[in-house]
């Protein structure tokens, strides 16, 4: 009997571990709240101009310092290369599958950065692998190509100029345990990796999330600009913050195990 009691005492370690994990999640929750508040504070600051000189200050390895600019609003203008892109997803919004469309943006000095133009729902005819925005862009360029051929211009315009208001993006996101590994060679991007995407599209490792864009064009296209779900001021949606549920889970488990321990310890013979 003494052996049983001694063995059951070892059970005490499990509720202690669960309590420790719950406490660790409390600290994680507090840390995440500070990150979110810092992002909110940055979003409230006046937008800064994302000039060529700003980009040059972060050339090379110093792009690692961009974390202090994450969630700062910026305004810029440049040439969006419509026919070059990566699709990040699929991501579900309001029960609909879609992708974020990320294209190169070329500034006046030729520097290229990444521009996340926003989320677009997938088309059923593509087996939900291509967003509507890509189909719309193809229609726009096909129309421009036909107009150019009528005017004796055999080249299709595959870029357009925009004024853009956006937010400096984080450079990487951690997916869940079930998120597949990115496969750039197959064009499959399941989680954000700005460095790898920059290599794929030959840009600097800097990405802007578009909040608003206005086309600069003296001869507007006869077709409307593709509709994207843009980024807004809802900063919290950019953070994976489930620490409160983890806190509840671990503390509940700890309390249950403590209850089992003390209840059955009293029943064991001395």
From Swiss-Prot:
It is a multi-pass membrane protein. It is found in: Mitochondrion inner membrane. GO terms for cellular component: mitochondrial inner membrane. Its main location: mitochondrion. The keyword Membrane applies. Pfam families: SURF1. It comes from the Eukaryota. Keywords: Membrane, Mitochondrion, Mitochondrion inner membrane, Transmembrane, Transmembrane helix. Belongs to the SURF1 family. Probably involved in the biogenesis of the COX complex. This is SURF1-like protein.
């Amino acid at each position: 009997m003494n052996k049983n009691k001694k063995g059951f005492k070892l059970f005490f370690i499990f509720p202690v571990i669960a309590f420790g994990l719950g406490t660790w999640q409390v600290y994680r929750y507090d840390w995440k709240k500070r990150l979110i508040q810092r992002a909110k504070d940055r979003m409230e600051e006046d937008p800064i101009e994302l000039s060529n000189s700003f980009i040059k200050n972060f050339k090379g390895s110093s792009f690692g310092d961009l974390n202090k600019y994450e969630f700062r609003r910026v305004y810029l203008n440049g040439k969006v290369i419509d026919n070059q892109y990566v699709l990040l997803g699929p991501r579900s919004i309001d029960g609909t599958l879609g992708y974020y469309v990320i294209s190169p943006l070329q500034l006046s000095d030729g520097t290229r950065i990444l521009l996340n133009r926003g989320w677009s729902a997938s088309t059923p005819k593509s087996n939900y692998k291509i967003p509507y925005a890509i189909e719309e862009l193809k229609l726009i360029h096909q129309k421009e190509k036909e107009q150019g051929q009528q005017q004796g211009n055999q080249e299709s315009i595959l870029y357009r100029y925009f004024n853009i208001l956006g937010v400096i993006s984080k450079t990487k996101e951690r997916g869940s345990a079930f998120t597949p590994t990115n496969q750039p060679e197959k064009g499959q991007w399941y989680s954000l990796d700005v460095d790898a995407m920059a290599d794929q599209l030959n840009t600097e490792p800097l990405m802007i999330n578009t909040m608003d864009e206005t086309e600069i064009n003296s001869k507007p296209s006869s077709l409307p600009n593709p509709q994207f779900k843009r980024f807004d001021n809802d900063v919290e949606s950019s953070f994976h913050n489930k620490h409160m549920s983890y806190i509840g889970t671990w503390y509940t488990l700890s309390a249950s195990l403590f209850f089992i321990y003390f209840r059955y310890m009293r029943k064991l013979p001395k």
